Every structure is written in C-alpha cells, then in structure tokens.
Amino acid sequence: MALNELGNCAPKYQTAYACEGKQLTIECEPGDLINLIRANYGRFSITICNDHGNVEWSVNCMFPKSLTVLNSKCSHKQSCSVLAATSMFGDPCPGTHKYLEAHYQCISAAQTSTTTNRPSPPPWVLSNGPPIFGNGSGLIQVPPPLPPRLPSLPGVVGIHGINAVQPTHSTPSSSTAALPGGRLKGVTSATTKHPGGRHDGLPPPPQLHHHHHHTDETVPTKPSSSSSSNSGSAGNVTSPSNTRILTGVGGAGSDDGTLLTTKSSPNRTPGTTASAANNSVNIGGAGTGSVVRTINNINLNAAGMGTDDESKLFCGAMHARNLFWNMTRVGDVNVQPCPGGAAGIAKWRCVLMKRLPDSGDDEYDDDLPAASSTTPQPSNNGGDCVHNSSSCEPPVSMAHKVNQRLRNFEPTWHPLTPDLTQCRSLWLNSLEMRVNQRDSSLTSIANDLSEVTSSKTLYGGDMLVTTKIIQTMSEKMLHDKETFPDQRQREAIIMELLHGVVKTGSNLLDESQLSSWLDLNPEDQMRVATSLLTGLEYNAFLLADTIIRERNVVQKVKNILLSVRVLETKTIHGSVVFPDSDQWPLSSDRIELPRTALLENSEGGLVRIVFAAFDRLESILKPSYDHFDLKSARSYVRNTAILSNDSDAATGDMQQRIRILNSKVISASLGKGRHIQLSQPITLVLKHLKTENVSNPTCVFWNYIDHAWSANGCSLESTNRTHSVCSCNHLTNFAILMDVVDEHQHSLFTMFDGNMRIFIYISVAICVVFIIIALLTLKLFNGVFVKSARTSIYSSIYICLLAIELLFLLGIEQTETSIFCGFITVFLHCAILSGTAWFCYEAFHSYSTLTSDELLLEVDQTPKVNCYYLLSYGLSLSVVAISLVIDPSTYTQNDYCVLMEANALFYSTFVAPVLIFFVAAITYTFLSWIIMRRKSRTALKTKEHTRLANVRFDIRCSFVFLLLLSVVWCCAYFYLRGAKLDEDGAPIYGYCFICFNTLLGIYIFVFHCIQNEKIRREYRKYVRQHAWLPKCLRCSKTSISSGVVAGNGGPGVGNTANQSAGTLSKSKSKLPLGAGDEARDGDAQQQQHDLPAAEDAIIMGAGSDCELNEAQQRRTLKSGLLTGSLQPAPVGAVVLERNTLRSTGMASVGHASPTSSAGSTHLIFAHKQQQQQQQQLQQPGETYYHQPDYYSWKHPPGGQREYYNNAGGAVGAAVGGVGGASPQQAHEVFYWTQKHNNQHGKKKRGGGAGAVPASPSGSLHSRATATSQVLFYPSYKKTTGMKQGPPPQQAYPHYAEALDPPNAAYYQQQLQQQQLRQQRQQQQQQLSSDEEQAEQHAHLLHLQHQQRRVGGQQLPAPPPHMAQYQQELLAQQQRQQYRNKHSNCDLSQGMGLGINMGMGHGDAYYNQGGSSNGGGDAGGPVYEEILSNRNSDVQHYEVGDFDVDEVYNNSVGTGVFNNMRAAVAAGGSRYGGGSLSGGSVTSRSQQQQQQQLKQKQPPRRCAADDDDDDDDDDDEYDDEVTAAEQLHDSVCDDEDNESDIDDDTHGLPPQSDERMRRLMALQDEDFKRRFQRQQRKNGMPLDYGASVQSAAAAHPDHNGAVFGVSGGVGEGSMRGAYRQQQTAKSPNARLAVNELFGHGNAGPPLPPANQTPAQKRQQLQKLSPQSTTSSSSHTSHSNPQHAPAHHLQHHHTQQQQQQQQQARHLSAMLDENNTVRCYLEPLAK
C-alpha cells in the first residue's frame, strides 16, 4: 500500500453493485471524498443480480456513458446515491436484467488539491520505494504495503525466507507468449539461486485449481495521519525496499479464498518491512508443488518509473471469453465471475513476458535514460544503507539498471485465455443430477449430452463435467444391462449408449470447442483427455462383452472411429489390421496385431478387441516435458517473463525447440483399462502430420496413471520423412512425438558472448598453426628424424588433432538443419576415436621398445606401423559405421553439430572406446615407467643409457600430452553440456577450454619441435639458406649450427702439452675460385687467430652467407672439378663446402661432424692437400681419423713416398727409409669425434693433449665411454653392374676378421632376416636425385684418383679440368642404367680408362674388382655406409659378447693371418695394406700344414665347399661351365632357399643389436657360394672379387682401401682387447670397434655380414702353401723391387702395434638424406 502525497496511507480500491431498480449508495469516511475509477450500467456477469439462475441474459451489456453519469452525481463527494434504472442510464440491452457497478476510492480532501483530474489507477498500480517527487510538489514519503497473501509452499519459509527460487520444469511458449498445454509430473524442490546467476530450472505452467471463492465486505479504511517531520527533505525518511512479484509464469490464486484484487490490509507501520530487502516470494498452486522464481528488490519508483511509466508494468484491459478484463498490474491475478449461463469464478494473471525483438526496441531503449534522468539524486543519511544497500545507490544509476533489466520484457496476460476451470454451465449441472438418479434413462442422457455439446458453448468446467458424466453412464450401464433378459435388446441398448458417448467425445474434440480446452490449466486438460479416452474404452467393452458371437461393430463420427471386434480364434489365420483404408480416410495410420498375441488373450474361444482412431486429439494431448526433452521447456523459459539478470536480454535469440505430437492418436485394447503385455509386439505405421523442421521421432503411448506420454515398451523400427514404424509390446493409445525446430536456426556461436567467440577463434587458430608447423617439420626435416614407428605415430596424432580442431571450428558454425551438420559430427566422432587410439599405440610402442631389442634400434618398422594404421583408423571407422547403421539420426538430433545425442548409442560408441583407449594408454605408460627404472639401474652400455634417457623423455612428454588433450576436450564437452542446460559454470569451462587449447598448440611446438636440438639447428639453417628471409635474420650467428672443429696443430692430438686448447682458423671464398685464392688462403692461414674449440665451432664466418653474391651462378663440387677452380687448402686444413661457399680450417684434436638439412649437401673436400705427420699418441686408446690427400702419399718427405703414412711416417724413417706404401685417395673427408677414457660418459669439451672435444648432439659420433672409438657399419646393395670379359684368373682368399661371434647358426639366421628387411627397404626407398648427384661426385673423385695413376708411379696427377675427365663424366651420365641400378660406391668398375666395358647379365654385388684389358686392378673398392639417421649414436659392445677361443685357435687362426702378412710382404700389390693384429711371420711348415688341411676337404658340396676352384690360384680359368655344374647350382639354390626358411623359423636367443651382428659376421660363405655360381653363369672368373693382373701391374703402388678393428686397449685389435679383458678379469670392460679388415689392391669386396665362423674356418683351411706362395710370387713379380721392404716393414709393424694404435684416414660424405658414404685409407703395415 502506497502513501498519498501528504504522507497518509494510499486510498483503498473498492467496488459497489446495485441491481436494476435499486439505489447505489457510495459513502466515504468524514474528510474523504469519492474518486470514481470506472462504472458500468449493464451486465458483464451472469451470477450478479441473478437469483433464479437465468442463463439466457446477455453478459456483454455495457452503457458507454455510465462513468460520466455517475461522476456527475458522486464525484468529489463524501457520499452519494444513484438509482440504477434505464431512466437514468438508458437501456443498452433490452430483455436483460442489468445492474450498476462502480469502482472507486475514498481520498482525502487535502489530496484532491494536488492531484490531477485523471482517475487514480487500481491499488496494484501503486508501488513503494525511496522518496520521489510527484507532480512538482514536495517530497512524499510512501510506505510500502504488505505483500499479497500467498499460499504456503514446500521449501518456502514464510514470506522472506528464500532469496530466489529456481524451478525445474516448464512448458514451451510460442513467439506470441502463448503457453501450450503441458503437464508437469512430480514434486519440484526449491533450490537457492544466487543473484546474478542464470536459472537452470524450468518454471511450470500456471497451476490453477478449483477454489471456493467469496468476497469479503468492503470496509473503509482510515488513512494514517503519520507523515514526515520534514516534508522538504529526505533526511529522516525511512524508505525500505519492497519485494514485488515479477514472474514469467502464472500460478493459482490464493487458496484461502482471498481475492488479491479486492482485499488488502493497510500497512500502518511502514518501518516493519524494512527487513524484507532482498527477499523473494514464490507463487503457485499448492496442490502441484511447483515453485516460481521471483525477482529481488525491484524498486520501481527509485528506478524513475513515475506516473508516465507505470503503464508499462500493467496488462491492458481487454475482452476475453465474454468477460471484460480490466487493467491489471504485473504479478496480480484478476478474478471475476464466470460469463453468463455459467456459475463460478474466472481468473487471469498478468505477467512479464520477454518481448520479441523488433525495430521498436531502440526507441524504447532511448527513452529509458530520459525517464531516469528526470529523477534527482537524494542524499543518504542515517541508517538507510544499513537496512537497504540498494538505497545507497544513486537513483539515476538504479533507474538505468532497472530499465536495462526491463527493456526486453512486456506485461502480458497469461495464459492466452482466462482460466475458467471453475465455470460450469447450468444445463450441465442438470444433466449431472439426472445421471445420478436411479431410474434415469442412460440412453436419453447420452443423446441429450451429445446434442448439448454440439450446440452450446462450453467452458473449462463443462469439460470436466462432461467426461465425468460419460464415466458415470458406463458404470451404471454395467449394472443395468443385467436387467435386460433379451440378448438382442441388451446389445441394442448398449450400442445406442455407445453411439451417444462416441458422438459426445467427437463434439468435445471438435474445433469449435478448442477454447473450452484452453479454459483449463494444463493439468486439467490432461485429466479431461484421460477421462474421455477411458470413458470411450469402458463403453466400448460394454458392447464387446455383450456380444457372444463373431461380430464387427463400427461407430464412425466426425472425429472418432471406433471399432468393436469379436473374433473366433478358429477363424484367425493372420494378423488383424485396423483401420481399413475405406473406413478412415483422414489418415493412413495402421495398427497390426499379431495372431499369437490375439490367441493368448482369448476367452471362451473369442477374442474381443476395441480399436479407436481419433482426430484432433493430438492438439489436446500435449507432451509432458519432464518425461521427454527438457530443451523444449528451456526454450520456453528463455522466451517467457523470467526477469532474472542482465544477461537474460541476450537469450531471446537462443535456439528454440519444442516437442509436439506429430501423428494422429490410434488405440487398441484387449481388456478394459488393462495394459496387457504381449509376447509378440504389435506394429504401428503412423503418418507424420508435420514434415518440415521436425526430427527425432519417438514412439509413445498414453499412460492413464500419469496422464502423460511414455515411451516404455515402444521402440522406433524405421522412419522416413512422412512415416514412422513403431513396435510395442503392450496395447493402449499410441502416437509419435517429434522435435520441432524453430525456423530461425542459430549455430553454437549464438550462445557465446562476444569475447568468448573471439577467444575461441584465436585459440583454435593458434593450435591449428602449431600443429601444421609440427607436421611440416616432420615432412621437411624428415632426414633429422629416424623413420621409425614413433615418428609415424606422432604424424598420425597431429593429423587427427588437426582434423578435430578444424571440424570443431566448422561444427560450431553450423545449424542443426544444415546439410553439413551430420557429416561434421560423424567425421569428428571418427577423428576423436582415431586420435585417442594413436595415443594408446604410442604408449604401447614405448612399452614394446623397452621390452625388446628395439631399445637400441631406431629403424622403420613398417609391419608394426601398418598394424597401428589398421587398428586405429579401421576400428574408428568400424565403430562409426556401426553407429550409423544402428541409428543415423544420433548425429543430427543434438542441439549442436559437434556432439552426438546423449543416448545409449553415444555412450557405447563414443564414451566407451575413448575411455578404453585412455585407460590402456595410462596403463602402458605406467608399465613403461617401471621397466625403464629397472633398466636404468642395470644398463651397462652408454648407448643403452642414451636410449633410456630418450625413452624417458618421450614417456614424460607423451603422458603430459595425453593429459593436456584430455583436459581440453573434457572442458569443451562440459561447456557445451552446461551451455545447453544453462548452467552457471558453463562459461568457466568455456574459458578453460580456450586456455588449455592454446596451451596444447604451444606444447606441441615447444616439446615436440623446439626442445629437439637437431630440429633447432634445422630451423636456423633453413632461415639462413632461404633468400626470401631478411638478411638480418639469415646473418645471425645463432643461425649457424654446424661446422668442423679445427686447430692450429696438425690432425690428431696436439704436439705438445702447451696445446691445451684447440684453435679454430677460418677463411672463406666463393666459387669459382681462381689461382690467387690459394695464396689468399695461405695468407689467411698465416694470420690465423685462436678460438676455443667447442662442439659447434664453425669454420665458416658468421656472416658468410651475407657476402654471398646472389647473382653468381651456384657452383658445386662437380663444377669445381670440371673447371679446375677449386681452391687448394692449406696443409693440414679441412675444407667445408656448403652450397656456393667453400671454407677451410685447420684440424685440431678432433672434428665435429657437420649436419645436413633438406635441400643442402654439405661436403668436406680434401683436394690436393698434404697432411702433416701425426705425432705419436700421448695416451693409449686414442685414435683419430685424419684428412687423407693424394699429394701426401705421392710426394712424401724424405723421398719415402711408397711407405709414407700420416700415422706411420716415423715408422718408415726408423727402418732406414723403407716403409709400406699407403695410397691416399682424394675423396670427400668427413670427420667424427672420438674421445679417450672418460668417467660416467660425460662429454669433455676443449682440446689439447689427451683431450678430444665431443661432437654436437645428434651427429654421428661416439658417446663418451671407456675406450670408445668411432664405429661404422657397412651396408650392401645388390646391383646390376657392368660386366667385363673373362680376365686372367687370379684367386684370393677371403680374409676373416680377427674375432668371430660364437653362435654361428644364430647369426646366420639373424643376418639373413636382416638382409631380407634391407631388401624390402631398398625396394621402397629409391635413390633420390640428391643421392644420384652425390654418386656422381664419388665416381668423379675416384676417376680423378685413377687418372693420376695411369701414367705410372712417378707421373704427377693431371689437373682435374682436363678434357678427359669431362668426357668420362659425360660417359658416366649417359649410362642411365648403370647409374640407376649401380651403387654409388661401385668405383672398382672401369669407367673409360682404357677398359673395355661390357654389359653383363644377372646381379652382382657392387664392389667387385674391376677388369681391364691388360689385367690389374681398376681401383680398390670403396665402401659406403648408409645409416638410418644421424640421431643414432654409435653402438658399443662388451668384449665378453664374443668368445675368441671357440672360434679360432692360435695355431690355425694366427697362422692364417701370418700367411697373409707373408704374402703381403712378398707382394704388396696383393696384401699390402692389410693390417692384421696379433701373430708373427708364418713359417713354411705352417703353410704346408694349412695346405694339407685344405686338401682334406670334400671336393664338392652345396656349402662352402663349392669354392674349391679357388684353391688352385695358378690354374687357368676355365670359361666352360658344364651342364652338371649348372644342375648342381640349381639344386644348391633350392637347398639354400630351404635352409633360409628353416633358419628363419628357429627361435634363437636375442641379441642386443643387429648392427653389431652385421659388423662382426663379415664373411658370408653362402654369399660367396652364390656369387661364384652367378659368375659361372655369366662367364666371369670364379674368384670371389678377382680382378685383372694388368690393373695391379699398372698401379703397383695402390693398396685397396681397407677396414680395420682396434679396441684401443693395447694391441690395436679385438683379440688383443679380449686378451686384456681376460687378463684383467674385468667382465665389464667395454670394447669399441673402429677398425675393419683389410685386403689387397686386387682383393675381393667386403662380403655381406652373414657368414658364420665355421664357414670362415673352412675357407681359411682351403689356403694351401702353393696357392699362397704362387699368389705371393705373382704379386712380387708385379712389384719385385718392393718385396723385401714389405717383409721388413711388416715385421716392424707388428712390434709397433704392441705399443700404440695407428691413426686412420677416413673419407666420407653426408648428403641431405643422411646417407653417409665412408672411404677409408689403407691400414699402415
């Protein structure tokens, strides 16, 4: 109750009536005057002034000038009397008894001087709040009224107990604020809602029930005389806030019978409600248990809502259901008598509805600040802020805030029509009385009922009465039918009754009675519909139970088709179908009952069935949203009058969906009111009423108990655009429920606010960019990585993540009806499953790596990767395909296009597989961690420690990666789910998704790319090598990542102890280089300055690329050789050529390997350079590779050319100027760092005496370990080479290594398997163009070396730019078949050097000895090394892995090697360069003993004995191959194949590394046997690796390139290391292999690594003294002048090997594909 302008209590709103012919007297208290509001002379209600219940009078009778006439008599008077007669007002409706109605207030006489002449609004218009200015007068204090009396509800403590209440159910609303019917089931619990949050409950529809209403007498109220002490100031004004009810949902009126619009108590103590601030009141029907959310602390007057704005919070006056509904304030219920002809009361509630967006909103918004700006800001004194914090705010800001909250709402009558549930027509009351009489005629009542319902207007109460009468008639007929003895009469009477009932039901469903249904609240609508259905069913079974023979009774009316069928069981031969096509043309619905179900429910040989089909019932039986999709109710809430917070204004455009009944209702029953369960389900075919914008069909039945639709027992068999087929296991009323999507579709982004939308775009974009960078890194820098299973796994993970991010970005932009919505959901489902599967396989791969030999190997495991691909994508696609087959609509039913509908299929095909993969990944990660910790404590090899460290890092990164990805998509899922349910925490999940998704992209880039040192260097080099990048970026020192460590000393260890640190000298030049460049380089060498030697020391200047002349034609090694413009490097310097730049530097204690990148080839070229002699090693175990060149061998100091060696120069001088010749091939030189003994495997930087700098991580180098050396692994290719004519026979034995592995069968099997894998890999990986170019470089270098030796020993080498070299290069380029099929290291073949080239047939191994016209060797073989990746560290093995004594004994093994040395001493051209450790000079008796052992071997077998032809070295080669030999060869081939298969099947013990087996098992008897057979077929020499004598004679100084083994532990051999280990009794001693085995210049090629020790012993035993002597004599004869020197040098070398190791010369090249080609110089003797 508000105060008037003088501070008194606001006047009370009162109503007075006077019947026609009576006096209307209006009287106020003394001092008060009458203020009329409205008046009417006529009739608006049938109950007022109608003592006899006449229902024929008009209830729409009004005299327009009633208020004018009454004002002239009573306005501003203390009392007045007016005669209610036509003489005074006229006769607006003749024949109708009229009455005079007046609405007025008694106002104070003082108040009339300050008020306008406008009638005051009803009392619910007035509001209370802080002081306001009214009409320019002084400040007025308005005390708040008491809140309306409300029914007490569960969970509500009094009036002020709960701040806010959130409901959980609601019904949908149309765009015009219509509230479709719907029933809520269950009790809703009230929960507390924090201010500012968004409700996530569903307010129920208005629950209006029948209430007994009475009107209390109007008691005039005397206004209070209390007023403010200071009317001009607000300082002492107490203005507590008033809690008003602003609800979006209507509710029942007060249950205590008080009319809220006519009865109110004055508030005589305004201050008592001050504590009611921030309180809320819920309102609703007590019977339903529903609660309605209310709004806190809306102070309208404080908001500036003055008299001009009050109309915005009132529902306008209107006519509805023959009643006039006056202006009503929001939140109040207008109650008045029912229309004429009906008894009871009608009610209608005024609520706030969210307005529809239109162009008028802007104007409305613009007006709000203007209205609020007119309100001045009062001062706040006293304790106002204590009781009401909101009153402390300035009124202007408060007004603006309220206006912002109210701008999208408008007052609306709710529901669409008044609630006339309590209005009942008088004539139905009489029918109800008749049906309850004992002797009443039921058929007569039924006919009268059908007649009245078809002609009279019904109200809501009439619907309840009608269905009740139908129920009562069926119950009475059940008893009365027994009084009819005649069966036919009984059937006729019941049939007549049924006809009347069916007709009445059809009338109730008719369109003309739709308003009568809308008069009922939703719960009553469902109750009436249930009563109608059961009444029809009961009456139908009355007839069915009466019929005793087979019969079919059909009752067809406008809206109902009823069929009663009584069938004999013996006549039922199939299913029973209802209805027939000619009986019910309104619909094509059909129900089919199987024969089995009918027979099970028969009685007395008869089956009684009742079928019914209804029209228009679907418009009555609305779905109940608590049973089905809550989205519909949520959509209703978003568009109804829930005034909650400021964010509600933005929810008007949310996606709207509503659940509707989209088919006719069809019914079948086998028992009255029984839900009979059937053993065989029935089939229903239902036609869709609406085909556009509908989805998600659901088969439902009407539950009589719950008065709601239920899907229990029914399932959807199939559906299309127009029909759905259902299957149910019981009988009742059936229909189809479907989702109706609003035509105005919105994507997922419509629910994002502006900031979140931008952040999601940024987050996804960042993640996508980093994923693409990671993929490009794996592709462009593939040479940096091992082509292993892990690389393939991470590539697949990145691809899946990229697909997920892009599909998510596309999906949130799509609407539900978009054609791409379903496709996006399907592919997103598949991508997520595949991604989680790859994470599982990554964890499994780590586990399998730790539990197998794969720990020390990083090779491409193609079968395992293919299995991963099959399981990942195959399983994912299978699961998605099954999901599509089961229910394709699952991908289109959800609100958003990035999720499946949350049903059983979603959990079984999406959630379950993801959880399985996730749990498996976590399990394997945990197991891997346990195994890794065990191995880290037991691992002995440095290589294994390194791999364990790498695996440990991979496991950590993968685990963090998996957790991060899980958090990202869990946040995304919870955000979408929370946004769908309007949860308050949804934005939190959204921003978490944004943050973690961005972090995921950064994590991928940092931990999978940046943390890798090799990739960092590749990035820097990529920047430096691309001209389109800025020069400042390319010139950065940080972009230079690789080089060669060099120093001012010679190659090797420093000469003195003063050289404690390595130095680096640098100079640079551009290609082509002229003659003057050599001098400039020399000057630069003289002026070198010292720089500390480090891992990544750079020979080239930091800004070398900045000086690159871009216009200069790019030159390579090839062009430099052709033009002769290569710059000679200083003595002892190392040359690095990178693209068009070429730099030189001095070698220090060691060299770090340069690295390569895609698109570049790095060459270290040692052309025409002499090396300084290496000083004696200062510490044992330190052996270094140094730069070989041609001139250091061609022109040795002191004239000792033939015996000069970098490492052995001093040795030659000590023996009187006689030394072993060691050829120096001018190949590209590649250096790896080696280190001496170190503790704990730590790197030691710097140089100096006894120190070797470690090479950078990722290069091919040896890790720091005890006596670690560089280890190279030879690999072999089977190629089609150029075959020559048959040369003179020259046989040489196969040299075995110093030590063989013990287990011959095991190694043979393992190595054969390795060869098979290598062949498969070679077939898959062809030589790239860069490899072919590198092949040309290698061939060209060898041609240069051979050409220098053509003229003899003393001739200087011709310049490299001679025309002959160019012709040879062109000839080589023209031979495409040779280049494409031949190894790049097959340099022993003749290439135009006067050699007759002939194309042979079949396959030959690449490094065979070449043939020429005059005999001799065309050049020693050069070996290549193909490593899978630079990331692979060098392997180290324990000496205990090999058992010397089991393989060789001292008498045989040492003698054999001594025989070789004797042969070398006799003829260096054959064995010169073979540096074999251990033993002494072999005596002739030993040779004879070996020859005798050799002669004892069988003459011919399919094993190694096939090589008996090699024993007779002096015999002439026989070109003829007999047929018996050919047959023998074929038989042996078959046996070999079978032997290979058997070997593969043996389960032999595992070995740590296959590469070690490849290294140690060098000789392969099987290969030798097959090679000789192939030679016989091709007419070639039977000697394995035989070459022409003329070549050896032409190049007597050449010793074939060899490999050697030195353990670095004294003797320089593996045997010596093994002996030291046995002596020291140290089983943990490590042995590093850095030296392979040698052969002569015309010796055989290095065989594949699959020969067993037994086969090698057999081959060694075949050596006879005669063959050895003859071969030695032959070699001595070709070079007789050097024979004695060889013997002497050989003996001296054996003595020196006991003291120190020899330095080796290694030539190598690394191309962009990380193929390393190694060339070793001959061993010093």
From Swiss-Prot:
UniProt GO MF annotations: carbohydrate binding; G protein-coupled receptor activity; mechanoreceptor activity
Region (GPS): 699-744
Biased composition (Basic residues): 1237-1246, 1684-1693
Ranges of compositional bias, category Polar residues: 259-282, 371-390, 1651-1666
Glycosylation, residue list: N135, N236, N278, N326, N388, N645, N693, N720
Topological domain spans for side Extracellular: 1-757, 813-818, 887-910, 980-986
Compositional bias per record (Low complexity), positions renumbered to this chain: 167-176, 224-236, 1309-1327, 1478-1496, 1667-1683, 1694-1705
Record PTM: Proteolytically cleaved into 2 subunits, an extracellular subunit and a seven-transmembrane subunit.
Residue span(s) of domain GAIN-B: 551-744
Swiss-Prot/TrEMBL keywords: Cell membrane, Disulfide bond, G-protein coupled receptor, Glycoprotein, Lectin, Membrane, Phosphoprotein, Receptor, Transducer, Transmembrane, Transmembrane helix
Residue ranges of every copy of the SUEL-type lectin domain listed in the record: 18-107
Disulfide bonds: C699-C726, C714-C728
UniProt feature coiled coil, ranges: none
Transmembrane region(s): 758-778, 792-812, 819-839, 866-886, 911-931, 959-979, 987-1007
Cytoplasmic side: 779-791, 840-865, 932-958, 1008-1725
Entry GO terms, CC: plasma membrane
Pfam families recorded: 7tm_2 (PF00002), GAIN (PF16489), GPS (PF01825), SUEL_Lectin (PF02140)
UniProt feature, compositional bias: Acidic residues: 1505-1522, 1532-1543
Main location: membrane
Cellular location(s): Cell membrane
Top-level taxonomic group: Eukaryota
Family (UniProt): Belongs to the G-protein coupled receptor 2 family. LN-TM7 subfamily.
Subunit structure as annotated in this protein's UniProt entry: Forms a heterodimer, consisting of a large extracellular region non-covalently linked to a seven-transmembrane moiety.
Protein name: Latrophilin Cirl
Organism of derivation: Drosophila mojavensis (Fruit fly)
Lineage: Eukaryota, Metazoa, Ecdysozoa, Arthropoda, Hexapoda
